[in-house]
């Protein structure tokens, strides 16, 4: 392959740089097993740790793994080395939407098609509790047929039911007024605003809000101070006006755009895609169950799956640290009692440090509060199914193994 040198990551030959950010480079990759191209996002682990962005990287991986939609970039696998994290993704050959725009407006039919694909993808995310929060042309890619693909979920959020998000993020020209006000906000409404800015840019060739100084730019956004150039139709103006409403409570929703807007609906065919089979049943079980303070979400299920366990992504190999996960067909409270019983059986004491998390130590050193031998956390999957995550931070491996065996035997005996 002329495009590729001798550098390889796993089964992938690594070629030229096709994208670059603050903490990562995206390289063109070649899968030697099937002859296909991929995009390999290579993240500098040390730099991410230095900036405290571990959770953001994990969030991007988990989000991309969860979502399965033709207008969202797909993730294939994650490869970790001592210094790098490599996310192997679908290769989108057409480049960024921002390159296609280049201060030049699109034909109405092309703009509508891309906007429909954007809305369809974002609506798919929102229906699964995922909010992008940084939608902009630089994060929208085009494939060889001109179809749109949403990428870069590093700022995405999955809040608890009814929660308001509070982290300010996004790019200045595309952020919603409520982000500028630095108040709690709805991730759904923020994404809708960004979609409106993108639609304006598709039709005009430039964004509605732009200025060299941030204070002036923010004032324009807060007042929704923009002017339509010649050529915009009444239907286009009405839709953009309803989207770029500074009040998130009265701003049009995605459902209203899809169902009610006449301009949007021209030639629109919604895409219905399901979650991947490996997690579909788990997510369905979650949606049917009642919520709790420690209720597991789909992202945690993915993180616990054998093909995408991110728990050690930023940890150096250390023979003194161990982690085990055991399933329990009990309520969370009953599972805590099982943990206490298993610990007692092997002469360990249990101290609750959170509602569903305990510290486990040999009884004779209980007074030494700085000595943490084991910890066990109960994560509720459904009201009668839990996952117990057991971690060893210090002490003898023998005691850790004895406790795990004791708990496993206790839980196995009750279902046999």
UniProtKB/Swiss-Prot annotation:
Active site: 134 (proton acceptor)
Residues modified as Phosphothreonine: 167
Enzyme Commission number(s) from the entry: 2.7.11.1
Record keyword Transferase present: yes
GO cellular component: cytosol; plant-type vacuole membrane
Signal sequence coordinates: none
Cofactor: Mn(2+)
Residue ranges occupied by any Protein kinase domain in the UniProt entry: 12-264
Binding site for ATP: 18-26, 41
Reaction(s) catalysed by this chain's protein: L-seryl-[protein] + ATP = O-phospho-L-seryl-[protein] + ADP + H(+); L-threonyl-[protein] + ATP = O-phospho-L-threonyl-[protein] + ADP + H(+)
One of the GO BP terms on file: cellular response to osmotic stress
SUPFAM superfamilies: Protein kinase-like (PK-like)
NAF domain span: 291-315
Residues bearing PTM Phosphoserine: 156
UniProt-recorded Gene Ontology molecular function terms: ATP binding; protein serine kinase activity; protein serine/threonine kinase activity
Lineage top rank: taxon: Eukaryota
Transmembrane segments: none
Known role: CIPK serine-threonine protein kinases interact with CBL proteins. Binding of a CBL protein to the regulatory NAF domain of CIPK protein lead to the activation of the kinase in a calcium-dependent manner.
Protein family: Belongs to the protein kinase superfamily. CAMK Ser/Thr protein kinase family. SNF1 subfamily.
PANTHER family: CALCIUM/CALMODULIN-DEPENDENT PROTEIN KINASE KINASE-RELATED (PTHR43895), CBL-INTERACTING PROTEIN KINASE 21 (PTHR43895:SF65)
Domain notes for this protein: The activation loop within the kinase domain is the target of phosphorylation/activation by upstream protein kinases. The PPI motif mediates the interaction with the ABI (abscisic acid-insensitive) phosphatases.
Name of this protein: CBL-interacting serine/threonine-protein kinase 21
Species in which this protein is naturally found: Arabidopsis thaliana
Upper classification of the organism: Eukaryota, Viridiplantae, Streptophyta, Embryophyta, Tracheophyta
Gene giving rise to this polypeptide: CIPK21
